[in-house]
């Protein structure tokens, strides 16, 4: 068209093919190693060399077990704790779900509450504790204010790089925080419909993006 050899654009009406986003889901072994590492390094003195924030291990557990995005973990508050489980309030059009408690989830929730209480009641700090339960976020900064998703992402990147430097996982085993949701959905017991319900997905196609399990099927019968 620029040199006058073509009077019309032959590409008009052609749409670019959508490429599936790459996921960084951890292998079961990598997940276990990194979770153990997070718990070990959280036991060190804060800001000591090689330490990591104490909230990372509980965040990993909740992101995996409740199949949550990072932002959905950040927005958990006291109203989401129910007698029978965690009310997962989901984004991007997904349905809310109630995930039944298991011992690891209970421990993770309690650890984050203890951490929040310690920050809010620290000596010399006059922090106004929110009266409404929906305003009491589970995950808070050292200032006592709700933790921003960007802060969680930055902490995760520093931690996962530390895990690789320490030889806990290789670069090929590196995974994202969002990858824990992929692993949680993939590990859900049941068929694709069960996984769709657990994830809160509206369509089976969305579940297909998160479920990476290889179907086990029976061979055909010969008549």
Specify the residue positions occupied by each region the protein language model found.
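Active-site/catalytic core of tyrosine-dependent DNA strand-transfer enzymes
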Residues: 102-171, 184
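Catalytic-site neighborhood detector that most strongly recognizes the C-terminal catalytic loop/helix
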Residues: 25, 90-94, 192, 199-223
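C-terminal catalytic core of tyrosine-transesterase DNA break-rejoin enzymes
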Residues: 61, 65, 71-72, 179-202
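Helix-turn-helix-type domain boundary/helix-start signal
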Residues: 4, 24-25, 99, 145, ...
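Short basic/aromatic active-site micro-motif
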Residues: 53-56, 149-152, 169-189
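Basic, Lys/Arg- and aromatic-enriched nucleic-acid-binding interface segment
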Residues: 6, 13-70, 74
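Phosphate-coordinating loops and pocket residues in cytosolic domains that bind phosphorylated ligands
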Residues: 16, 36, 75-76, 83, ...
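Conserved tyrosine-mediated DNA breakage-rejoining catalytic core shared by Y-recombinases
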Residues: 5, 13, 25, 71-130
């Amino acid at each position: 068209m620029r040199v006058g050899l073509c009077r019309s654009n032959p590409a008009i009406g052609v749409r670019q093919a959508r490429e599936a986003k790459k996921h960084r889901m951890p292998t079961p072994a990598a997940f276990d190693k990194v979770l153990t590492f997070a718990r070990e390094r959280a036991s060190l003195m804060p800001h000591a060399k090689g330490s990591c924030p104490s909230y990372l291990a509980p965040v990993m557990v909740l992101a995996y077990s409740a199949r949550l995005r990072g932002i959905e973990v950040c927005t958990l508050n006291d109203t989401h704790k129910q007698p029978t489980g965690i009310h997962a309030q989901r984004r991007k059009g997904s349905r809310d779900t109630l995930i039944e408690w298991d011992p690891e989830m209970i421990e993770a929730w309690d650890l984050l509450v203890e951490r929040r209480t310690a920050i809010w009641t620290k000596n010399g700090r006059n922090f106004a504790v929110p009266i409404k339960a929906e305003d009491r976020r589970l995950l808070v900064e050292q200032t006592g204010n709700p933790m921003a998703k960007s802060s969680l992402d930055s902490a995760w990147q520093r931690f996962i790089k530390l895990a690789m430097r320490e030889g806990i996982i290789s670069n090929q085993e590196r995974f994202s925080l969002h990858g824990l949701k992929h692993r949680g959905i993939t590990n859900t017991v049941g068929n694709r419909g069960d996984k769709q319900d657990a994830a809160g997905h509206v369509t089976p196609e969305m579940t297909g993006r998160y479920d990476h399990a290889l179907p086990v099927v029976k061979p055909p019968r010969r008549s």
